[in-house]
């Protein structure tokens, strides 16, 4: 949760963008061109743009009417991507191992994005309200496609990580109400990320968006790293709320990535982000884009410099502790140590430890702690699930005469 040293941006990942499926689906996207993807969506990639974008006009939109989506939407056949895996896997694994990095398989255009690539952004959001049944059918079809895709990718590439894209909001808000996201997209993604986790692969979800209202859902459905965490999400507050359930990768927003950004400005921005976010743990400082590097290379240089400087210093991590119960004299007088023991001790060694501490039975407590260690229990569990439980039961009556560690 609080590594030493702090990871720097994408340095832990070797991203494979040349696997047979990604090459088949996105290989014709070239800067300065207009092309069609395998779903039939027109993709424009202007010379001066940071990335490609879908084009929607009445003539070009693949699915202009979701009530007839089965007539116009044709899922790409990934069975044609059966060749070239061994060469790709061998080359990518060798490169990742040589760099001491994790091999990451890349999956662009997630379930929501695929919907608006086919229909247009406004029509997708409108259809969620006006045609929910048809949208569920389309989403299920895309989900099945993504599950087939990731199965083939894991089988063929054997990656350590799957890096999957799907933007769910702007920098200030979700694209839809949280309950609507839960209704249409939460369960499909639970299946998607659940499958990846079942294969022993790390899950990273890219969304450079404001996602505070659904961050607990993201952790629940199996996302391990949220890449693209914008500063607008209030990262320190999220760290306190999540308590390690989700690693946040981001913090360096697009506002600093400018041609006129000066070294002192970039360093000051990065240092402030590091000082606020790194002590909370489960944080990887990074540009929030969905692939490594900034648009303007000099910005990346100074962001990296700030992280390296941070790592050269001495930092004391923040360790959250459970709240200490208030202690009142009146309650202490009312509290008495139970004299009698129950006829039958609980089979739970942690419960027995809590009871022994609560009753002030020092020898028994020490004996039970040794028993727990002999049974393979972790010291941290003995403390948190046994001793601290007993202390909390004592509450206001807790004192040096009543309990001990």
Label the model's feature ranges.
Residues 59, 75-81, 398-405:
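Short gly/ser-rich anion-binding loops that grip negatively charged ligand groups
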Residues 46-67:
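Short, surface-exposed, low-complexity cationic segments
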